[in-house]
Amino acid sequence: MIAGLDIKELVELALLLIAVGALSGFLAGVFGIGGGAILVPVFYECFRIAGVPLDVRMPLCVGTSLAVIIPTSIRSFQAHYKRGAVDMTILRVWWLPIVIGVVAGSVIARYAPERLFKIVFVAVAYSASARLIFGRDSWTLGDDLPQGPLMRIYGFCVGILSTLMGIGGGLFSNLLMTFYGRPIHQAVATSSALAVLISIPGALGYIYAGWPAAATYPGVSALQIPFALGYVSLIGAVLVMPMSLVTAPLGVRAAHAMSKRTLEVAFGCYLFLVGSRFVMSLAGGQ
């Protein structure tokens, strides 16, 4: 037995993570997200079953999710870039404030209580769910993205919130760009590039933030802290990454070939369910 699990249970967990990798990669391509909205709740359940201590469980999920997003987002960005759909002007304005936001989020992760990660995830999941399910073309903030300080503030907020949630930023940047009248396909493509900017420094930040936690739990068994770099689980990342790389280009192909309304509603419902799961976790302390 490993981490209190028999071989059958370990195999089931491994197969679940592989399947989730395929789904997260596909969604990374379709929505321009890194897949963290799928990965974080599944990692949470897997780490709970494996007996990871509650104090480090949520940040370990977030850090591992950001690590998985690195290759997935790069693959997705390359596919969108080849189609000429990425708005490089937005990237030039946003890259620095996003990176600063990621660094700030990583510092918060080192000292924040575990509940904070869940609260941020719930708030954003519910907001994005409402936008995806009930959103209308008339829901706008302006005819085009703002210039000057407000645009950079948006970038900073995307960076810090994405880092605390363990996502690639696509949920935020998609919402912002479409609220300002940008075509959904351009928003998706540009978001895939932002996920690269967020995931690399974000994962490194969680490795740094989680280093003290690894020393705090020296007796935790094999599937848990010893097979992690800080708040990044190597086992979780290795199981999820390969399939996510395979399916990301398939998601890009689907994004440019189909109506997104059905997928938007389905994903919005999923986010609502995930948010509700973490609400119950906050209430019950599990």
Can you name each region flagged by the protein language model?
Residues 1-31, 38-59, 73-165, 175-186, ...:
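Juxtamembrane transmembrane-helix boundary motif
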Residues 65-72:
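A structural-propensity feature for long, helix-poor, extended segments
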